[in-house]
């Protein structure tokens, strides 16, 4: 891992980008890890869960370095507090991915015909919100390096709306999943039921935090 001093030597926003890349590397495992669960490849699932934890730890290291060494007097188009808030929200997404991965190692879960397809739609909608937010962050980084005006700023604001739409659609799918889980016809072991609820709740955190991050970026754009 590059030192923070070297990263700041390249650009004041390089550490933010380095942290973002580590967050992406955590979330990228979400679809493969649930696919492994569905297919019964539990050893692969355990390996991926460990990799997610390793990546999350690296993201934490970058976050902590920024908190400790980000110069207060550095001239930037966004405040030091603003940068630290953005990286904190980014980091919460990596935390959520790790939480999901760890939950899947506690007990072997099963997919059931009545919820499998809906769950993967729900997962994909959360990942869609995250991917849109990553696109927004790349646009935001370009704006930071130049200015906050023009069509790029307009494109960034449109992306914020798309993230909010994806998060809402994720909420709708989550409610549909809950209706299945609490229906009289859906009968599974109690421990598995409880663990699935935790998995679904934490998975929803990906789109929740993505929307929060998108709104924080939008606030920065509106301040300019």
From Swiss-Prot:
It comes from the Bacteria. Disulfide bonds: none annotated. Belongs to the UPF0111 family. This is UPF0111 protein CPn_0681/CP_0066/CPj0681/CpB0708.
